[in-house]
Regions:
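Glycine-rich, often proline-containing surface loops adjacent to acidic residues and nearby aromatics
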Residues: 129-135
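Short, charged amphipathic alpha-helical surface segments
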Residues: 60, 77-126
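Short glycine-biased active-site loop of nucleotidyltransferases that positions the nucleotide triphosphate
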Residues: 51, 126-128
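A short beta-turn/loop motif at secondary-structure boundaries
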Residues: 40, 128-129
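Basic helix-turn-helix/winged-helix DNA-binding cores
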Residues: 1-69
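N-terminal short leaders/motifs
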Residues: 14, 48, 86-93, 130
């Protein structure tokens, strides 16, 4: 079996070349997102082909965009199939999701600023007045 493993990269080598941590690579193996090319039967070491480094870099990039794992899985599958347009569409959809989230967060920040500026009692009184249940 040792001859079959020649030329493969260790998980540490892939981690260094891709920017992913060893822990992340193990996780992506467990969730079947980025499987090693082989696992050494004696040591249990995960081993990767050199072309898997580029795939690991793509996973790292997509996760850095806060893409959920299932969307990463979809984008990686499209990329491996040579379908760059589908990868772009996944990213565009995620951007729209993030934009909506940022809008919600800006609203929350505005309400926090109002609360801090006016004080809790004043804000609660405003809420009672606007809901028609002033005491």
């Amino acid at each position: 079996m040792q001859g079959d493993l020649a030329g493969l990269l260790t998980i540490g080598q892939v981690a260094r070349r891709s920017g992913l941590s060893v822990k992340a690579l193990r996780h992506y193996d467990r969730v079947q997102l980025l499987r090693p090319a082989a696992v050494d039967g004696g040591s249990g070491y995960r081993l990767y082909r050199s072309d898997q480094v580029e795939e690991a870099r793509l996973v790292h990039l997509l996760r850095s965009l806060d893409l959920p794992l299932e969307q990463v899985r979809t984008a990686v599958a499209a990329w491996k199939a040579g379908d760059g347009e589908s990868v772009s569409e996944v990213i565009r959809l995620h951007r729209r999701h993030l934009d909506a989230r940022v809008t919600r967060l800006r609203g929350a920040l505005h309400r926090i600023d109002h609360l801090l500026a006016e004080g809790l009692d004043a804000v609660m009184t405003d809420l009672d007045t606007t809901s028609g249940t002033a005491t």
